């Protein structure tokens, strides 16, 4: 899917709506494009794997702080995803 990237945390509905109107992304994030750009500039292969942690709205900061999750479940899911990516290569 399409990912928008930028240099600020999207923490309100107005900013979210503006981004959606501009490029209709499936999600937004802050670091992936920068990492990919530097890797490409230096000839280093790069894959970005992200976990979405909030809804990019007024409750975004709260979700990051109060959401409980099982680290075991996270690791198991991430392992399956990465293994499938490696097999596809």
Can you annotate each of these PLM segments?
Residues 1-89:
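Glycine-rich phosphate- or other oxyanion-binding loops that anchor nucleotides, phosphorylated ligands
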């Amino acid at each position: 899917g399409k990912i928008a990237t930028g240099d600020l945390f999207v923490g309100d509905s107005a900013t979210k709506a503006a981004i959606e109107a501009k490029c209709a992304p499936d999600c937004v994030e802050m670091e992936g494009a920068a990492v990919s750009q530097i890797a490409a500039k230096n000839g280093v292969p790069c894959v970005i794997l992200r976990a979405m942690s909030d809804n990019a709205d007024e409750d975004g900061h709260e979700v990051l702080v109060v959401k409980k999750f099982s680290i075991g479940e996270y690791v198991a899911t991430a392992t399956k995803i990465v293994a499938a990516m490696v097999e596809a290569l």
